[in-house]
């Protein structure tokens, strides 16, 4: 059964400067080989700015860059960006394969405390991405607080969160990532940023990978620009779900 080698890039972001951020991640991705998935934070071209979509890089430019990096690393490159589309501005999680196939998920739960819901359009589609034998559920930041949206109907193996999650609520980030792994009997990975942004928000990172039993198998030091690696085991995941099949007793409802 295939394992999955995942890398999370916990990095600072340059406020509202797409080219500078792409140059920064060029340097971070240089020399990375032997990975299956490489994850960048939420809004990795701009930081969490409400006006980012209006002045953002075009989706084609971002996708072309991500495709080149996916080919360079022979890995799925994942991260969200603020984009202007024909139907409005979105916080779009892009997952790009080396062959150029593009998957995307538009953030469902918009962070009203920062007026995100006034500047961006909420997505309404839950997406599962199949990659190298794994089923991946992409989610963005505030989505983490809403467990129904990440409810595992035995349809995914890894929930992948990207975030700009502020330091004052870091305990929530850590606890909820663990809860999502335990309740869904799935791997969970959360890639958060570090540093400060143009709104004066501070971020400590705490990026991590958690196994289906809630054990942290890789974690980043707080406030550090760093990279963490983990290898996920499909055999261990299936064995646990077979030996402790709590998912079979889940309440029967769905909202999508």
UniProtKB/Swiss-Prot annotation:
Catalysis: reaction(s): a monoamide of a dicarboxylate + H2O = a dicarboxylate + NH4(+)
GO molecular function terms noted in the UniProt entry: 2-oxoglutaramate amidase activity; omega-amidase activity
CDD domains, per the entry: Xc-1258_like
One Pfam family recorded for the sequence: CN_hydrolase
Keyword Hydrolase: yes
Domain CN hydrolase positions: 4-234
Catalytic residues identified in the record: 42 (proton acceptor), 107 (proton donor), 141 (nucleophile)
UniProt family annotation: Belongs to the carbon-nitrogen hydrolase superfamily. NIT1/NIT2 family.
UniProt-listed PANTHER family: OMEGA-AMIDASE YAFV
Protein's recorded name: Omega-amidase YafV
Annotated organism of origin: Escherichia coli (strain K12)
